[in-house]
């Protein structure tokens, strides 16, 4: 009798879980990774912190919104006949928390900083901050205003403005490329598949796009999207990073190769 009683209890609990929408247990099932939104900031490489300290804080204030950002200039070595180019970096979801420079303590900023310094490229890097409760799409006009201000103040070459984004920032990147296909010479977007975009606009900007192998439910779905982009005329470099999960792919996406892809446009 006790055996039947416990079987009855187990069946009741199981039905209760199904009624609440809980997924059944599957051995080996990989729980979904939270790609966007707020999440605790992880411990970062000390070198990333040192790089972040070399950036200068600034802000663009309007009656609607105050856009805070960090910026850094890089001096040209050799040929100084060209105007400086501009890199705009959109941070991930965790960057919306906090008030310090934690959100630029990232592999993207560090790798870009090291490359521009070693190569002696005349450039500026700017990293705006998206505040909690907003998305890059909702504050995009303020990002554009920031870019216009920097172009005027630092004599930026408007034909060489590059967009970079990680995770939540890459989702913002797809939105900005959809809104302003005329603005960016090229873009690198890491660890956020295109979901909401305007195809005929996005394909006008060359894109270097990466995803971690273990950050995809079905790789073939992503490849199908890339084929659609290319059929519509896109110049897109798509790389699956072997064996990497979401967080690993966010950090390892940025390389000399990806930066050189941007700079050749």
For each predicted feature, which ranges?
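Sec-dependent N-terminal signal peptides
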Residues: 4-13
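Primarily recognizes the serine-hydrolase "nucleophile elbow" in alpha/beta-hydrolase
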Residues: 148, 152-153, 159-204
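Loop/turn elements at helix/coil->beta-strand transitions in domains of secreted/extracellular proteins
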Residues: 82-86, 120-124, 157-161, 180-186, ...
């Amino acid at each position: 009798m006790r055996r039947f009683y416990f079987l009855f209890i187990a069946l009741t609990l199981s039905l209760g879980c199904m009624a609440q929408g809980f997924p059944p247990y599957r051995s080996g099932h990989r729980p979904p990774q939270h790609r966007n939104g707020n999440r605790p900031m992880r411990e970062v490489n000390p070198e990333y912190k040192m790089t972040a300290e070399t950036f200068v804080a600034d802000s663009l204030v309007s009656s609607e919104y105050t856009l805070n950002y960090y910026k850094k200039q890089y001096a040209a070595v050799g040929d100084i006949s060209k105007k400086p180019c501009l890199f705009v970096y959109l941070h991930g979801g965790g960057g919306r928390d906090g008030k310090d420079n934690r959100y630029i303590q990232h592999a993207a900023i560090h790798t870009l900083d090291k490359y521009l310094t070693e190569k002696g490229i005349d450039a500026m890097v700017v990293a705006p901050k998206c505040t909690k409760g907003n998305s890059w799409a909702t504050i995009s006009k303020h990002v554009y205003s920031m870019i216009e201000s920097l172009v005027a103040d630092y004599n930026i070459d408007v034909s060489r403005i590059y967009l970079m984004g990680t995770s939540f920032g890459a989702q913002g990147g797809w939105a900005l490329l959809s809104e302003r296909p005329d603005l960016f010479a090229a873009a690198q977007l890491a660890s956020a598949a295109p979901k909401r975009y305007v195809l005929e606009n996005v394909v006008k900007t060359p894109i270097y796009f990466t995803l971690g192998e273990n950050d995809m439910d079905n790789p073939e779905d992503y490849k199908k999207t890339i084929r659609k982009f290319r059929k519509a005329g896109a110049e897109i470099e798509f790389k699956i990073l072997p064996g990497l999960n979401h967080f690993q792919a966010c950090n390892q996406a940025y390389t000399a190769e990806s930066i050189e892809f941007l700079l050749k446009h």
